[in-house]
From Swiss-Prot:
It comes from Archaeoglobus fulgidus (strain ATCC 49558 / DSM 4304 / JCM 9628 / NBRC 100126 / VC-16). This is Catalase-peroxidase. The gene is katG. InterPro entries: Catalase_peroxidase (IPR000763), Haem_peroxidase (IPR002016), Haem_peroxidase_sf (IPR010255), Peroxidases_AS (IPR019794), Peroxidases_heam-ligand_BS (IPR019793). HAMAP family: Catal_peroxid. Heme b binds at H249.
Amino acid sequence: MMRQGGVMVGARKRWITDWWPNRLNLKILRQNLQNPYGEDYDYVEEVENLDIDAVIRDLKELMRSSQDWWPADFGHYGPLFIRLAWHSAGSYRIFDGRGGARDGSIRFPPRINWPDNINLDKAIRLLWPIKKKYGRKLSWADLIILAGTVAMEDMGVKLFGFALGREDIFEPDESPDWGPEEEMLTAKRGEKEELERPFAATEMGLIYVNPEGPGGNPDPLGSAQEIRVAFRRMGMNDEETVALIAGGHAFGKCHGAGPADYLGPDPSSSPIEMQGLGWKYNYGKGKGSDTFTSGLEVTWSPTPTKFGINYLRILFTYEWELEKSPAGKNQWVAKDAPEIIPDAHDPNKKHRPRMLTADLALRFDPEFSKIARRFLENPEEFEKAFAIAWYKLTHRDMGPKDCYIGKYVPEETFVWQDPLPRRDYELVDEKDVEELKRRILASGLSLSQLVYFAWASASTYRNSDRRGGANGARIRLKPMSVWEVNHPEELKKVIAAYEKIQQEFNEGAKGSEKRISIADLIVLGGIAAVEEAARRAGFSVKVPFIPGRVDAQQEHVDEEFYRVIEPFADGFRNYFRYPERINERDVYTTPEYFLVDKANLLTLTVPEMVVLIGGMRALGANYSHSDYGVLTERPGVLSNDFFVNLLDMSVEWRAADDYRYTFEGYDRKSGELRWRATRVDLILGHHDELRAVAEVYGCDDAKEKFVKDFAAVCAKVMHLDRFDLWRSNRKLYKEITAGLR
């Protein structure tokens, strides 16, 4: 380390997280807040004016125009673009809806640097002329998926459909937990069925599984088990899994022309003159026939730029023996087979058929094999299954079909799109809304019940894949109706009360087409409770409410999905199922970590999260009706008492259980027990940044601000999933979901 001109040279700046790595990180509540296109930029409006057919023509021309700086395998970039699209979409996992293709985050670390994504930086650069031409009208996120989809069509796949509507982010998304490992291609996340949540990939830096087999062991049956778990965790069943693998491996090849020792660093670690490209391969030409990606050298089909059943035919025709690739990786070669596989760059060369361990899994696993053989015998069924599975893979994080844009959106709707019935009645007006609020408040339901179940319905929304939310009132249907956190028996009584109000209103609207849904009533109940609690605090507040939600039926519910996403933590309701797992030396095991995680899924900022906690506690909207965090003598009054008492230095807090999940607050002078709270409550007074916001709401002059802010954030959460508005009245949707921004 040297000092030059008063400046320390060679010293690395230390960030707060370097010094205090276990400090609760709130960064994910303030990422991607700015768009370089400006505040008025609306991608939906832009992409609706895109000439998609012109883009498709340009893509097809590009795919057949091999570039010297990165030559196309078999003279066609289609397989490379399919891999790019697949790896963009394929990082999606069902547990939290993160990953996937909807925001173009494959362009950023860590995903662009994963070993499984080697040379996809080249694929993105090849697409730059298209992006440059269409600019603000075409996002990278849409272009990447469109390129892979057009490639399939150009190589013979009869597509099922395609939708535009994916909006780019402009910085890395740091919300996903990709795993605890410190090195790429290692695993500390459990195995097979014991793979920890929320992970789907088996190793750090992979999309799914190690293609050599579990941990590099060439075991086809073991690979099948890992494949099944990984694909299920991204929402795919066995048939979809086989279709995707068999269809995807109809195209292109793997690359392992030489030793891995010659491979340069990833894009983020490469020198500045590389301009964001990485993986420079200093072996032979370093491209074309001398390319390294996975280290495996496999071309699956004799027709690698034409869709068909040749992959399956080859897989089941030959017997296979283990060999090493030129890079020393485990792969399989067909015994006594002729050289029928074309070379990617030399038309005069042929190769014997080869497969990956992950390919042999489709042959030797009994269930996979049964499906694969059926596809082999029924090519048309296979093509349709693959087209639908590809559509699902590339669209399942986009949300309901209201979010789909463009002329190629198919008519058919699937349960994974959270479908809803069409509304066939007139909406209530403002006068009706006020009357319904009056009836709800007179129904015998408490304010805490009204808020609790409105939150229970709406807060299932997650912006990661735009699923869940209050529209549809799925809370009254299985499996949400039996979630532990939703108080199943109490929920039945609450729904019954709403059904009575609904029936009386709808029957009383004779001569009119006006109707009210249970979904609207649940939200309206929460809003009525907030307004009444504000009135009790001495303030008049009007919480925005836009009717138009409809009621889903059981056939509209993706039951497997909603079983998987049952929450084990909801800090807003002071619910945490696993206090025994808390380790204070590991923030990722704590309920406060999961509070921030849920706040991110709800698109909340730090102040929005803080004010919501304070309001929910003031209203007593706690799991099991507990008094944890209800730091007020007047629950049901929308006061800032929670913050006042949390910040009160006359109270001393002590752990109340061995897990250090619950705490008791004692008067420092008298020793009298005054309050009880959880870690979620106390973190707002302990964490410096959260305390800074809590102090804003704990001031004497903050009572009205607290009420107004809580009302605004409640309105935001209750309307996040209103994609009917998102499409039909974007200005209104943006206003009502603006929260405190």
